Amino acid sequence: MFHFARCSRLTRGTVTSDRLLSSHKTRDFLFQHLNRRGNHSAPWSSSQIPSTQLTVGVPVLRVWRQAQKLLRLTSRQQPRPPSIALKFILGPAALTVTARLLGPSAHCEADVNNNKVPLEVQVKEKIPEFSWAVLWEFVRPQLFALMGAILLAFGAAALNIQIPLMLGDLVNVVARHMREQAGHYMRDIQAPAVKLLGLYALQGLLTSGYIILLSRVGERVAADMRTTLFTSLLRQDIAFFDANKTGQLVNRLTSDIQEFKSSFKLVISQGLRSATQTVGCFVSLYFISPKLTGLTVVVLPCLVGAGALIGSFLRKLSRKAQEQVAKATGVADEALGNVRTVRAFAMEDRELEMYAAEVQKSAAMNETLGTGIAVFQGLSNIVLNCIVLGTIFAGGSLMARDDLSPGDLMSFLVASQTVQRSLASISILFGQMVRGMSAGARVFEYLALDPSVPLTGGGRIPLDSLMGRVDFMNISFSYPTRPGNQILKHFSLTLPPCKTVAIVGESGGGKSTVAALLERFYDPSSGVVMLDGLDIRTLDPSWLRGHVIGFISQEPVLFGTSVMENIRFGKPSATDAEVVSAAKQANAHNFITGFADGYNTVVGERGVTLSGGQKQRIAIARALVKNPSILILDEATSALDAESERVVQEALDRATTGRTVLIIAHRLSTIQAADLICVMSNGRIVEAGTHLELLSKGGLYAELIKRQRSNGHK
């Protein structure tokens, strides 16, 4: 839905509209008013406006004049600004503020010469909302443990209310013996002392109990959230990962869930306890001394409010310090992760300087934070001591008039400090709860996503009757992250069974996109991809990728485990003999057995301990171990040296026998024996034929061959 709004001049002949009107009624009025007054290439209405693109042909002065008139009409119901200048300032400003707070925004351009200019609509990123229903699904399995923790927390809070009263009884016994010098002191003090010790012991047990239960609940909820989120992320289509950075996704799995777990445990334990103690101790204070309670009610909230403000400042400073620590960590992570590049350019000193600079900034911020905390704690101690002194002064006056006993004064002091600590804890927990809910909302946002391409579900073709014929029929496609850039345009191609088809062309022509559509990483915008006459959208994607198609990319990614497990990744149920057989087909068996640990050799993160040719041959073995009917080679040898390319090409020649093969080629020397070579340009096939046929045409293929030979490729 398009929203028209405030216009601001960008260039001499162009204006840009980038704000919306808050009212649908106002928006429709503006459109209708413009339709009556202006000459447009097409009528505008709220129901006729396209969601993604509009063509505007209204002269800019007319548009601005109508917008000003609308502002005057809508401002009649409100007091007018004192001057015309103020009107021109406040009118657009009000629209701007409203636009910042509400809904999506749009960007349009209108040329003063009435030329048609495309209008793009961009929806603002929606802030994720916290879902209590989703939280309930995670908490429900731990409900009994959670209820037990809540009951124990209430019990501990109730005991904390009783402890000041018991302390008062103890003080009264001591004061009576000091005043009267009568009776047996040890006998009189024994009963209240034993009761107080019993309360302390029971309070300790209850506190330990609810902390243990809450820890159990929090850890299990966090584990379930991590597992569920990771499952949701793995099920997302490739377009999702194109649009989101890996670091952000990992941060949701780690930092956000950790933040939510900590907030969840703190809010339930300390929040319930603090709230119970605050209410209970206030009641106790009133029964002990209504007069002192009145003074406390006046003073205490002011002090807590001031403490909350200072605490808010310190929390912001703490957040900045943590962000600076994260920057320093990022520098170190980048340097250590790319240590080979750092070493190759002798940049160790520069990386050290960068890291030291970030660490120094972090240290300075943390020193400032430490100073702030020290000042805050010092002032807090002064204020607390002043409160104690004031309470003793006022309580002493009441004691002098026999309105208050020494024990009651002691009880009042302890209870009032309990209230103050509880209120301060609640104010801190409020900020913690906000951060926790924000973190939870970010996690829940990804849990609710449904992939456009499902991971499983659909039909399967019996492998013994699978022929391997692939048809691309009138395919048009744009990547979801770049909808305005069409990669394939009415693309059609047939891969005959057990034949090799190569696609060549300049970079950006759409070659790798064809392979991605066959793997069903994406669905085409229009057209259909067929496998043995069936639309692949009706087939099970997991079966298609796991049993039918083998994919070998230009830069294979290996996992930081053994060679055996890396090859078995292509078929988890493969036996050791099947793994060895696949390695032999890929020309990898000899160099693998040359390792000290053979197939149990750990290849390091991303296969860092292997050469490019070795990694590529292990990747070929990984694809062959599942015996695929269709093989996709996406520039599988373009990154290798001549010797490695020769060995890998021998393996590929063996692997392609008896299979339908799609080759995405950069080095044209590797595809001269293909049954069909298709030359792509701008998303279309412009030439097709065998190597000799295309050379004889003297077209784009011949030009590419000539260009590569002049650059040193055979």
Swiss-Prot record:
GO terms for biological process: potassium ion transmembrane transport; transmembrane transport. One of its GO terms (cellular component) is mitochondrial ATP-gated potassium channel complex. One of its GO terms (molecular function) is ATP binding. ATP binds at G505, E506, S507, G508, G509, G510, K511, S512. It is found in: Mitochondrion inner membrane. The chain crosses the membrane at residues 143-163, 194-214, 294-314, 373-393. Component of the mitochondrial potassium channel (mitoK(ATP)). Belongs to the ABC transporter superfamily. ABCB family. Multidrug resistance exporter (TC 3.A.1.201) subfamily. This is Mitochondrial potassium channel ATP-binding subunit. It comes from Danio rerio (Zebrafish).
